[in-house]
Amino acid sequence: MKRNKIAVMILTVMCFATLCGCGVKSGEEFTEEVNILEGAALTVDAERATSTGITYTISNQSEKDLSYGRDYSLQQEKDGRWYRIEPKSEVAVTMELLWIPAGNADTEEISWEDAYGKLPAGNYRILKSFSDNERGYYLTGEFRIE
């Protein structure tokens, strides 16, 4: 039973990793629901945000264990709406299955200079996909580049 559960979780994460940007072309508005899992949050350390990377924390105070991967995408805010930013070069991430048990948090640091270059001044957010045993969720964390 546990082996089947792990296999389902791996397949779910792989599907989300593959579909994370599907259907949304660069410059198109992103309209999917985000941040709807009660008790789960992705926050960006505003003091450490630069044009080439951020440090963010995933907090899971929900009652569910969450799984996720290393993949992410960046979006830019324009006129109160969010638009996907197209990477300047191919992005390769490992297909690791990472876990955040209920009641825990994890802090990550990422650099996107190779994929996105240096971001100009503006409002941005990182988008990551997560799943529990029942469904998938998008979590976002907003930040500003001066």
What are these regions (language model features)?
Residues K2-K25:
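Sec-dependent N-terminal signal peptides of Gram-positive bacterial secreted proteins and lipoproteins
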Residues I6-V8, E86, T107:
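Hydrophobic alpha-helical segments, principally membrane-spanning helices and signal/leader peptides
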Residues L11-M14, V34, I58, A92, ...:
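Short, functionally important structural connectors and interaction interfaces within domains
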Residues C22-E86, E90, W99-I100, S129-E146:
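Primarily secretory-pathway and cell-envelope proteins
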Residues E90-G117:
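Intrinsically disordered, low-complexity Pro/Gly/Ser/Thr-rich segments with frequent PxxP/GP/PP motifs
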Residues A105, L119-S129:
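A short tyrosine-centered beta-strand micro-motif
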